[in-house]
């Protein structure tokens, strides 16, 4: 009776005369109790992604002011009962979070959700003028797009600029 709900990653709006700088407050993932479908109840917020130590911005929410690439939840691994080759764990959520990379969460306690691990691909080695979105300011950032997890624990991640990664959980994220 629980449902994971995302707000698609928001983006700053850029126009020929400049950008509109606006808050991106809704880049969240939520746990919602839907045991009564007429009264869904928010029971938890997923942890907001932390930036790595060497990240050039104080948080992911403001990075769009100086570089290309949105931030926010984009795609979740969605196991389906009729697909036995996909991981069917109910205690994990995998989310491609655009510029924040792939995030893996432990939802075994739906009221206290913990981030277990993350993967951030390297930034693409391309010039801003080679962008899919010409005219946007700053360097390009890696953006994870979609993810899927098979029954062996392999995580398949697509990225906007540089292709496809096959990852394997290890350590605490594998438990």
Regions found by a protein language model. Name each.
Residues 1-175:
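Feature marking well-ordered beta-strand scaffolds used for ligand recognition
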């Amino acid at each position: 009776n629980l449902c994971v709900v995302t707000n698609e990653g928001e983006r700053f709006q850029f126009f020929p005369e400049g950008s509109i700088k606006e808050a991106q407050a809704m880049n969240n993932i939520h746990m919602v109790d839907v045991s009564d479908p007429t009264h869904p109840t928010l029971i938890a917020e997923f942890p907001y992604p932390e930036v790595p130590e060497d990240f050039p911005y104080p948080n992911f929410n403001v990075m769009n002011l100086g570089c290309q690439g949105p931030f926010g939840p984009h795609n979740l691994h969605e196991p389906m009962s009729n697909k036995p080759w996909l991981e069917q764990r109910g205690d994990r959520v995998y989310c491609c979070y655009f510029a924040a990379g792939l995030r893996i969460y432990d939802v075994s306690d739906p009221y206290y959700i913990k981030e277990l691990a993350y993967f951030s691909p390297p930034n693409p080695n391309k010039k801003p003028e080679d962008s899919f979105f010409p005219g946007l300011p700053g360097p390009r950032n890696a953006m994870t797009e979609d993810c899927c997890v098979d029954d062996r624990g392999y995580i398949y991640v697509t990225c906007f600029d540089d292709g496809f990664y096959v990852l394997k959980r290890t350590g605490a994220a594998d438990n």
